[in-house]
């Protein structure tokens, strides 16, 4: 029995360890003069994606590249970064970062919420998200939420489990359309694909996924009444991380990173002109 319990705890330890990541703490980097942070991610159009060569790129990636350069230039150390995980699942990435140790940062469309602040540390916000209510192009435009039971009659709402957009869909169901049919997906990408493939599907999707659908010319319709621009995205770190003060300093330096030409160039590069126009709407 004793041997069985020992084996059980060893297996539990190794299984748990395999589900998390490790990176060097700022304290270690400062002491040693060198180190590496681990960058976990969830693939998100424009924010974190792979280019034609298979290289990870995007808004989040470019910002973290600037952060690493800033640390090296201002602190006199040699900091590097490595990507961990496969980027396939929001919930998986979030949970692994939450349970990780040291210099681990999660990248993607992670909304800053009070609930999540109890589980992970956040960087300052790096963008204001623009969540968009979408359907097939043949669905009449929704004039007001009270019309959901009639305008969206017979439609199914798709949403990825554990996301802020899932909460939005459930709020619509509770407040305006109790008989609404819902279907869970694993990722936001899957949600988009479901709506594209189902003429009677609808969803809330972040700006990046809406732009992807528009580029694909899939006949997706935006319902402006549903636009939501109150939330902000941030990078996440485990609660044991000592990198958050340095991250805050980076965003505040030189008049504010979000006010810099480097940041604006990153947005234009990955969102394009259509995305920039919608971002201006989000800021109003």
Segments from the language model and where they lie:
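Extracytoplasmic small-molecule ligand-binding "clamshell" domains
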Residues: 20-109, 118
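Periplasmic-binding protein-like
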Residues: 41-43, 127-135, 140-141, 207-252, ...
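Acidic, polar ligand-binding/catalytic clefts
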Residues: 65, 76-150, 220-228
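Ligand-binding cleft/hinge of the Venus flytrap
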Residues: 65-81, 162-186, 214-215
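Hydrophobic residues within well-ordered alpha-helices
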Residues: 67, 94-98, 191-197, 235
């Amino acid at each position: 029995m004793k041997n069985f319990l020992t084996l059980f705890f060893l297996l539990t330890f190794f299984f748990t360890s395999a589900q998390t990541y490790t990176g060097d703490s700022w304290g270690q980097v400062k002491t040693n003069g060198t180190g590496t942070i681990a960058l976990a991610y969830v693939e998100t159009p424009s924010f974190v994606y792979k280019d034609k060569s298979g290289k990870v790129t995007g808004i989040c990636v470019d910002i973290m590249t600037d952060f690493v350069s800033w640390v090296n230039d201002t602190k006199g150390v040699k900091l590097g970064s490595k990507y961990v995980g496969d980027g396939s699942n929001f919930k998986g990435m979030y949970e692994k970062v939450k349970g990780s140790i040291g210099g681990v940062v999660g990248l993607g469309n992670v909304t800053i919420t009070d609930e999540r602040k109890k589980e992970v540390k956040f960087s300052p916000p790096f963008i204001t998200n623009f969540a968009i209510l979408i359907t097939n192009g043949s669905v009449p435009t929704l004039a007001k939420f009270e019309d959901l039971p009639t305008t969206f009659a017979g439609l199914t709402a798709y949403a990825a489990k554990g996301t802020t957009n899932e909460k939005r869909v459930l709020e619509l169901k509770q407040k305006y359309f109790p008989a609404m049919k819902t279907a869970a997906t694993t990722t936001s990408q899957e949600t988009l694909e479901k709506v594209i493939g189902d003429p009677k599907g609808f969803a809330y999707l972040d700006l990046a996924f809406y732009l992807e659908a528009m580029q694909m010319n899939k006949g997706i319709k935006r319902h402006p009444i549903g636009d939501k621009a109150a939330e902000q995205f941030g990078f996440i770190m485990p609660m044991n991380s000592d990198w958050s003060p340095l991250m805050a300093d980076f965003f505040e330096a030189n008049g504010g990173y979000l006010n810099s030409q480097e940041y604006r160039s990153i947005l234009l590069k990955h969102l394009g002109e259509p995305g920039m126009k919608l971002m201006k709407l989000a800021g109003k």
